[in-house]
């Protein structure tokens, strides 16, 4: 069973990441030295705990966004994703021989919206191929 981290350690780590994200790495020793240079931390033990939790959060950030932490690079990436517009529309009938291939749910949605599009309903299997299954 692991140890519980205090609120002080968590707050300090989040503040470090938000301010100094580009300088931090996935290496504990590097983060420890950076904590020493940047912040005035009372004890060596507290500094090590903060550096360790910072390293842990950096590893989580590599996998995806972490709740409670926002830094400039993450905000820019989120903004870019929100502003994304595909080059070719999925509703472009000239590319698909005048008929859109959709599943049952999409067909019902299009009908409920009152759009008059030529649709071809295709059955979609709920089971994915083994090769593409996510591994935990």
Swiss-Prot record:
Gene Ontology molecular function: any one: structural constituent of ribosome
Biological process according to GO: cytoplasmic translation; ribosomal small subunit assembly
PROSITE patterns reported in the protein's UniProt record: RIBOSOMAL_S17E
Entry's localization field: Cytoplasm
Pfam families to which the protein is assigned, alphabetical: Ribosomal_S17e (PF00833)
Xref: InterPro entries: Ribosomal_eS17, Ribosomal_eS17_CS, Ribosomal_eS17_sf
Entry GO CC: cytosol; cytosolic small ribosomal subunit
First-listed, main subcellular location of the protein, grouped into a coarse class: cytoplasm
Key words, A-Z: Cytoplasm, Ribonucleoprotein, Ribosomal protein
Its job: Component of the ribosome, a large ribonucleoprotein complex responsible for the synthesis of proteins in the cell. The small ribosomal subunit (SSU) binds messenger RNAs (mRNAs) and translates the encoded message by selecting cognate aminoacyl-transfer RNA (tRNA) molecules. The large subunit (LSU) contains the ribosomal catalytic site termed the peptidyl transferase center (PTC), which catalyzes the formation of peptide bonds, thereby polymerizing the amino acids delivered by tRNAs into a polypeptide chain.
Additional facts recorded: Present with 30500 molecules/cell in log phase SD medium.
Family per similarity comment: Belongs to the eukaryotic ribosomal protein eS17 family.
Subunit text: Component of the small ribosomal subunit (SSU). Mature yeast ribosomes consist of a small (40S) and a large (60S) subunit. The 40S small subunit contains 1 molecule of ribosomal RNA (18S rRNA) and 33 different proteins (encoded by 57 genes). The large 60S subunit contains 3 rRNA molecules (25S, 5.8S and 5S rRNA) and 46 different proteins (encoded by 81 genes).
Protein name in the entry: Small ribosomal subunit protein eS17B
């Amino acid at each position: 069973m692991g140890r519980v981290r205090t609120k002080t350690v968590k707050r300090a780590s989040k503040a470090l990441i938000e301010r100094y994200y580009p300088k931090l790495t996935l290496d504990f020793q590097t983060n420890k030295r950076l904590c020493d240079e940047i912040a005035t931390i009372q004890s060596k033990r507290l500094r090590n705990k903060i550096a360790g939790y910072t390293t842990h959060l950096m590893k989580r950030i590599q996998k995806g966004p972490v709740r409670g932490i926002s830094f400039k690079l993450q905000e820019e990436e989120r903004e870019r994703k929100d502003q994304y517009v595909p080059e070719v529309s999925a509703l472009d009938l000239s590319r698909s021989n005048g008929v859109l291939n959709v599943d049952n749910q999409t067909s019902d949605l299009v009908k409920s919206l009152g759009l008059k599009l030529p649709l071809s309903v295709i059955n979609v299997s709920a089971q994915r191929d083994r090769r593409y299954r996510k591994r935990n």
